[in-house]
């Protein structure tokens, strides 16, 4: 499969994959959670630098609050948090007198909190198969629907970064009628390391460079 890849990134990579037939296009959206805009200036990121040089590098303004769940669901729906319902990683539900939390599966998996229409549902309405790896909302029955292929966040075993890439590549190797044309892939780093160690630290720098190497693996394969 020939791959023509362009990039627009802050914490987000957009990979456009063009298959052998020119009329069939594949898009892989990759999130490196917590990847600061200036990390490529602070640390060695040759793969991201190469993608920016080959394609496009653009400014992205996050939605507010700039937290994982509201921002990733904004990217999926095109709606700001107060319109799509996920207004923070944790918030108080006044109507039902309970707390929503990304760490509480009972509320996190409740579709009544998720408004709007994620892009994978829109794509499937157009007859496009989709694949989703750990993106916010993808394992929840929003509008009684799931992506064609997806991995629940609480499924065991929890996949390593390398296993996630292998799974995505397996999806892309399916026979064309079964192959997802829209794939969304989430990595929770370097967010965790940045919070724990601070952005200007050797451990965070090592994680940033590791995430860059994974982008290189995804491009190469």
Predicted regions and their residues:
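Bacterial Sec-dependent N-terminal signal peptides
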Residues: 1-23
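Coil residues (strongly favoring Ser/Thr
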Residues: 20-23, 50, 55, 105, ...
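Solvent-exposed, acidic/flexible segments
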Residues: 24-29, 37-45, 64-69, 109-116, ...
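Beta-strand elements within well-structured catalytic alpha/beta cores of enzymes
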Residues: 24-36, 50-51, 75, 123, ...
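His/Asp/Glu-rich, glycine-adjacent segments
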Residues: 80-207
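Generic, well-ordered alpha-helical scaffold segments in large soluble proteins
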Residues: 171, 218-221
